[in-house]
Every structure is written in C-alpha cells, then in structure tokens.
A protein has these predicted regions:
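Bacterial N-terminal signal peptides
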Residues: 6-16
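Positively charged n-region of N-terminal signal peptides that target proteins for export
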Residues: 1-4
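N-terminal pro-sequences and low-complexity stem/linker regions of secreted or lumenal proteins
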Residues: 21-294
Length: 294
C-alpha cells in the first residue's frame, strides 16, 4: 500500500507541473552538475555588493565565475522571493508570515520524483525536520521547502547547517544553504553586516568552492531582494568548472534561475519558470572525449 501511495504521489507531482518527462536529458548545450549548492543572502542591492570592499570574497567569486549584472528579485518582502525560487510561484504570499502550508509541486518534489536528491541546510535550525517559525537567528520564512514538509518534501530534507557534509561528494543533487539572519546580511547596518556575511561565506563554504573547481559541482549565490526599492536589483553569480567567466547583462530573475535548474536535470517546468528563459549562455563547452583505438 505504501508503495502504491508513493507512486500516486509522484504521478500527482508530475501531472501538476510542466509536461516534460522527469529526468529527461538536458539540452546538449547545458551541463548536468553532480551537485548544485544555492546560497541565499538577504536584502542587499547589487550596488551594495559588487565592487564593495566590504565583500571581498563575494567579489572574488564574481570575478572568477558568471556575474549577472541585471538580476532581479520578483517581490517584496523576503518570503515570496524564496517561494518563487522554489516553486515557480509566490503562492499569493505578500508578507513574511508563518506558518504557511502548500501542497503543489516544487523543485524538491520534482527532483525526488526523478530519482535525484535535495536538502536545505539552515544555520540555527535546532534539529532535522524542525517546522517552527524561528530559533535563535533562524527564520522559517527563509527556508521555503519546509512549507511543503510532510506533503511532498520529507522532513529528512530539512537539516541544520551542521549537517552540511565534510565529504562534498555526499552532497545532494541540489541543496539550499540558508545562513541565519546575523550572517546573511539581514541584521545590522552596512558595511558591518555585509562584511560579516562575506566572512561567513568564505569561512563556511570556501573549502567546498575549492573542491568544486576540480569536480562537477556548481555554486549559485543570490540575494532574495534588494533593500526594498521598486527596481529590486540584486546580485546573482554562478561559480564552477562548467561556468564561463564573465559579466552577463541579459535580464534574469528568480524564475530564470529556477528554470535553469529544472532544465539542467530535465525536470518539468514549474509555474512562472515556464515563461522565463533558460540561462544557457554561460556554460563552457563540454570537454571533447579522447578518441578510442582504431
């Protein structure tokens, strides 16, 4: 019976997402990373970060990877941006309220249905599967997957950051890293809060970044929203061995990045990601395979 219910859950997930078969091969010009790590920072405009001496590590990453100079959040305040990135919809949420609960398809449910894996690693989460609204400097509004927990996202995918593996080959296919509000640039005034967030990222993830250089792994760093302006201009950057270094001026938003993740893994499209263009212009060509014996 449990097996039948699991099959029905997968069918339901796929039937309410786009029509593409789950796990289909990516387009020939797209890579398929073994791992993607997405780091969410908070409430800073593009001009607050790029070129700012208070963010030396992030600017180093931007210079070695793909920097999107016209990247935008999709709403204010924070929570609808996280929901949009995770599910292709703000779910009609216009505040940072807690708790909310949703039952439609999302990035994690599609990954699981196609045989891939997903986890969120949140700083100050007190225990795996914690569904409370806050703990210390953790806020549920920054952890979108928990809003589907127990529906189509298992509690085992909702983890404290202390569970981020030291053996990076054990990372899930896609993971979200959520610093607490002291370390994601949310709390405090610039430049101190920016410097603190930059230092946290270097301290906690530079070992992964250096490992990813020689492995098929992709880091994405983005901001949920800017400081509340109508423009909502934020920084987004991709870093990894498959990424072609440069500054890219095509307009993107959270739906564009979600669309790209779905396309990398051949997953059905979600909500407004179907109307977004895939980011298909920042990738190194695949390495040519050596010719075999004749």
């Amino acid at each position: 019976m449990h097996r039948i219910l699991n099959v029905l859950l997968v069918i339901g997930t796929l039937s309410t997402a786009g029509a593409r078969a789950a796990g289909a091969p990516p387009a020939p010009h797209l890579p398929r990373p073994d791992h993607v790590v997405v780091v969410f920072e908070e409430n800073r405009a593009y001009t607050h970060i790029i070129g700012n001496m208070a963010a030396p590590y992030i600017n180093t990453l931007a210079n070695r990877g793909a920097l999107f100079s016209r990247s935008f959040g999709v709403a204010h305040p924070s929570q609808p941006n996280y929901l949009a990135f995770f599910s292709g919809s703000t779910q009609n949420i216009t505040d940072n309220g807690c708790p909310y609960r949703f039952n439609g398809p999302n990035l994690a449910s599609l990954l699981f249905a196609a045989g891939f894996t997903f986890a969120t690693y949140s700083e100050d989460l007190p225990a795996p599967g914690f569904a409370g609204c806050r703990n210390l400097h953790y806020e549920r509004k920054h952890n979108p997957a928990v809003n589907w927990q127990g529906v189509n996202v298992p509690a085992s995918a909702n983890l404290p950051f202390t569970h981020f593996p030291d053996d990076f080959s054990r990372l899930p296919t896609v993971s979200f890293v959520v610093p607490n509000q002291e370390n994601d640039m949310h709390n405090g005034a610039a430049p101190d809060t920016i410097l603190r967030g930059d230092q946290w990222l270097r301290t906690k993830l530079d070992a992964y970044v250096r490992w990813a250089d020689t492995h098929n792994s992709l880091l994405i760093v983005t901001w949920d929203e800017d400081d509340g302006s109508a423009g909502n201009h934020v920084a987004t950057l991709f870093v990894g061995p498959m990424v072609r270094q440069g500054v890219y001026a095509r307009r993107i938003d959270h739906y564009s990045v979600l669309r790209t993740l779905l396309d990398l893994y051949g997953l059905p499209l979600l909500g407004k990601s179907a109307d977004a263009a895939t980011i298909d212009y920042v990738w190194n060509p695949p390495a040519a395979k050596a010719a075999g014996p004749r």
